[in-house]
């Protein structure tokens, strides 16, 4: 193998490693800080072992601060196609838990809550928070 080919392979390997090392809050990731579909809550989604979990960390109406820190997403597992499924989401307005499928779409997050069948589901689009939010205190 000549020196140019070796050098090209080294550069290509370094580029692949660099792309793989992009942090979890990259544009195609479900982790990070998200504004929910109502615009009233900020949820921080993070890795919890091999799964995802999420907590309410910002509230537009600080009078509802008792909900601050509530875990509203849990045990969501990676599945094919970059999606996450098999966990749960808590709806504080309804006081109920549902199954959830999460699909990252750049700076948007498709969050589908369902009970039993995905045929009977509600899909919400969350958007990535553009900056730092003043976190509520739990």
Where in this protein do the model-derived segments appear?
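Bacterial N-terminal signal peptides that target proteins for export
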Residues: 2-12
């Amino acid at each position: 193998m000549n020196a140019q080919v070796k050098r090209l392979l080294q550069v290509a390997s370094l580029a692949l490693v660099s792309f793989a090392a992009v942090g979890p809050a990259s544009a195609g990731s479900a982790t990070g800080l998200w504004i929910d579909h109502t615009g009233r809550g900020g949820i921080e989604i993070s890795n919890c072992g091999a799964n995802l979990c999420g907590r309410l960390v910002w509230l537009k109406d600080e009078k509802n601060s008792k909900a601050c820190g509530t875990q509203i997403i849990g045990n969501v597992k990676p599945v094919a196609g970059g999606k996450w499924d098999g966990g749960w989401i808590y709806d504080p307005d309804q006081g109920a838990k549902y199954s959830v499928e999460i699909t990252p779409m750049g700076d948007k997050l498709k969050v589908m809550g369902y009970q039993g069948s995905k045929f009977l589901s509600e899909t919400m689009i969350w958007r990535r928070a553009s900056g730092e939010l003043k976190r509520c205190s739990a």
